[in-house]
């Protein structure tokens, strides 16, 4: 653990031993108006992150995603925005960047297609071995789009040799270290 913290201090210059609020994650399943309820859930977690917010929904056939800078109440307060996020399943995220740059591409949830189907992922906390895992994945040919350690989780899920999405998630969890919360949404969870 000390080794990973030392690496974070040296390479990323982001380590802050003082208590800071961090991201908030929310998930809801099999309800009408999942996007609106997720926006309300994120609003109740607003104190945990105010840089950006995002929601990924699933309607049984496809995924929908919306990510924006700023507060939940300013971004998910219009019916049109919420109506575009169709589905009865949703995950959401409030961003407070502890790792990665404050850019739109780092706002979660992230979505990826894997050989087992699509998956949406949101996480809060810090992965103490994210630099090691990221370097290992890059050496193995992975291409990263963001500077967020959450993408490391997505890459581990996608790269897993397991056949079922839930097994891919478990495989990824066994590789990451640190304190975190994780929510996912996937079609294969519904079967």
Question: Residues of each region from the PLM?
Answer:
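Conserved short alpha-helical segments that host acidic/polar catalytic motifs at enzyme active sites
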Residues: 1-191
């Amino acid at each position: 653990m000390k080794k990973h913290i030392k690496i974070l201090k040296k390479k990323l210059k982001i380590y802050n031993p003082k208590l800071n609020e961090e991201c908030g994650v929310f998930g809801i399943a099999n309800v009408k108006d999942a996007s609106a309820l997720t926006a309300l859930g994120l609003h109740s977690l607003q104190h945990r992150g105010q840089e950006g917010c995002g929601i990924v929904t699933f309607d049984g056939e496809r995924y929908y995603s919306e990510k924006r800078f700023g507060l939940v109440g300013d971004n998910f307060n219009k019916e049109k925005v919420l109506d575009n996020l169709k589905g009865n399943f949703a995950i959401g995220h409030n961003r407070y960047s502890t790792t990665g740059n404050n850019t739109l591409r780092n706002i979660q949830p992230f979505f990826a297609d894997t050989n087992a189907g699509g998956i949406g992922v949101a996480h809060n906390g810090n992965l103490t071995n994210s630099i090691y895992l990221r370097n290992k994945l890059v050496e193995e040919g992975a291409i990263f789009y963001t500077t967020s350690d959450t993408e490391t989780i997505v890459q581990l899920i996608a790269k897993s040799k397991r056949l079922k999405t839930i097994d891919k998630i478990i495989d990824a969890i066994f590789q990451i270290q640190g304190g975190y919360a994780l929510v996912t949404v996937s079609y294969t969870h519904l079967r």
